Regions:
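Short glycine/proline- and aromatic-enriched beta-strand/turn motifs that initiate or cap beta-hairpins
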Residues: 19-57, 63, 219
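Residues that define the transmembrane beta-barrel architecture of outer-membrane proteins
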Residues: 24, 44-50, 90-94, 116-118, ...
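Extracellular loop and loop/strand-boundary signature of outer-membrane beta-barrel proteins
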Residues: 36-40, 77-88, 142-149, 198-204
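Predominantly the C-terminal beta-signal and adjacent terminal strand-loop region
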Residues: 78, 91, 165-231
Length: 231
């Protein structure tokens, strides 16, 4: 009887251990992608940008961190009368972000589809964008297109994306392949360099840019324990 009880307890212990996993709490990475402008100009042009980030993982599916971006945001209405404006913003952006993935909310261990989409996440944050805009040069005393070539604006990012996890020899998550779509709402008129607040062609909408990116992240540092297996 004692032998049977010991065997049962050992089995329960093994099952319990198997249902848990370890994960690294620190992640750094970067990537590149394409920006698109949604400003006072009608044509929503594309630009290129890169990013770098560092995250702290509370669990494999809940994180918070910092991100920096650098690249180009463009718009071009030169062939669209009557305004015929353009801009190229050589911007830098810095944000604090939090993300929660589906794996924190569902039991993904029961079927293959749930396991595949466990890395699907939603996130938001707060930041600052530094604008350096190349735009129409005017010699008029009263400019036809008022605005500033250099400015700073508050930035509110919303992230939607998916992570794909890859383990090391210890079955800890070591690498993450990331696809992310980010929409950035700015407070102010600096993103395109044009302040249309007193003009009849004012759009009435805040300046926004989106950023679709592909990136790779490397995880390391202290190790945490999660209640479910990641792989």
């Amino acid at each position: 009887m004692k032998t049977i009880l010991t065997a049962c307890l050992s089995l329960l212990f093994c099952i319990h251990v198997k249902a848990q996993s370890n994960f690294y709490k620190i992640s750094v990475g970067g990537g590149f992608g394409v920006t698109q402008s949604f400003t006072d100009l009608k044509k929503h042009s594309f630009g290129l940008a890169g990013y770098g980030l560092a995250d702290y993982y509370f669990t494999p599916f809940i994180s918070a961190g910092i991100e920096g971006q650098m690249g180009k945001i463009k718009g071009d209405d030169t062939k669209i009368p009557p305004n015929e404006r353009y801009f190229t913003n050589s911007y830098k952006a810095f944000t604090l972000n939090g993300r929660i993935a589906l794996g924190a909310l569902i039991d993904y261990e029961k079927n293959g589809f749930s396991n595949t989409i466990k890395g699907l996440y939603l996130g938001t944050g707060l930041g600052l964008v530094l604008n350096k805009v190349d735009r129409i040069k005017e010699d008029r005393e009263v400019p036809l297109y008022p605005g500033k070539e250099s400015s700073k604006n508050l930035l509110f990012p919303v992230n939607v994306g998916i992570n794909f996890y890859f383990s090391d020899h210890s079955d800890y998550t070591r690498y993450i392949l990331n696809f992310n779509y980010q929409s950035n709402l700015t407070i102010g008129e600096g993103l395109d360099g044009y302040d249309d607040s007193s003009k009849k062609f004012r759009s009435g909408n805040p300046d926004i840019y989106t950023y679709f990116s592909v990136g790779l992240r490397y995880q390391f540092g202290s190790v945490g324990l999660f209640k479910k297996t990641v792989f």
